[in-house]
A protein has these predicted regions:
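Electropositive, glycine- and tryptophan-enriched low-complexity nucleic-acid-binding patches
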Residues: 1-4
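Conserved beta-strand -> loop -> alpha-helix junction used to position metal-binding or nucleic-acid-contacting
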Residues: 6-13, 18-60
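Acidic/histidine-rich catalytic cores and adjacent linkers
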Residues: 13-16, 23, 53, 57-175
Length: 175
C-alpha cells in the first residue's frame, strides 16, 4: 500500500500503533462524527448542567465546520467555553477513602479529549491547504462514515445473515 497524504480514523488505539509503525509521518484526521459521539457519551444526550449543554452544542457545531474560518471560529468558541468553566471543571470531591477526584469527571475527560486533539492538530487536518493542494481534490474527508456505512456495512450485514459461520469462514467471506 502506498503512503497516503492523510488518514481519517475513529481514534482506536490499535490503529494508532499501526500508524506509528507503518506511516509515522502521515497526518491524522480524527473522524469528526466519532469525536462528536465521544463527547456526547461523556456529556450524555441530555446534559443537565450548563457546561455540559454548551459542550454538547460545541460538539454538534464541530460537524458543521467546512472551512478554515469555521474551524478557527469553533476553536475560539471552545477556548471561550474552557475559560468560562475552568473553575467549575477544577472542582474536586473528597471520597470516604480520603481521595480527591474531579467532581465533574466526565466533563473533564471530554475537555481533555478536545484539548489533546487540538494540541495534536487532529481535528481540522482535512482543511490543511498543503494537503488539499497535494491531493488535487476540492475537499478532503472529515469523517470515515463513507467507509463504515459503505464497504464495512456490507461485510457486517453478510456476517449478520450467516451468524453461525465459523470465524475463519467469516474472514474468508470478507475477502
Amino acid at each position: 500500500i502506498s503512503t497516503p497524504l492523510m488518514v481519517v480514523t475513529d481514534g482506536g488505539s490499535g490503529f494508532r500503533k499501526a500508524m506509528k509503525d507503518t506511516w509515522p509521518q502521515v497526518r491524522i484526521q480524527r473522524c469528526l462524527f466519532h469525536v462528536y459521539l465521544n463527547i456526547t457519551a461523556l456529556t450524555s444526550k441530555r446534559p443537565r448542567l450548563a457546561p455540559g449543554r454548551e459542550l454538547k452544542w460545541l460538539a454538534h457545531q464541530l460537524l458543521a465546520a467546512k472551512t478554515p474560518k469555521d474551524a478557527w471560529q469553533w476553536e475560539q468558541d471552545y477556548l471561550a467555553w474552557e475559560a468560562r468553566w475552568a473553575g467549575f471543571l477544577a472542582e474536586k470531591s473528597v471520597y470516604a477513602t480520603g481521595e480527591y477526584k474531579d467532581t465533574h469527571a466526565k466533563l473533564v475527560r471530554a475537555r481533555n479529549l478536545v484539548r489533546t486533539l487540538l494540541r495534536q492538530g487532529q481535528l481540522f487536518t482535512f482543511l490543511s491547504p498543503a494537503l488539499l493542494a497535494a491531493s488535487g481534490l476540492e475537499t478532503l474527508p472529515s469523517t470515515n462514515n463513507r467507509l463504515e456505512g459503505g464497504i464495512n456495512a456490507q461485510i457486517r450485514r453478510m456476517w449478520g445473515w450467516h451468524r453461525g459461520m465459523p470465524f475463519l469462514h467469516r474472514v474468508k467471506a470478507a475477502y
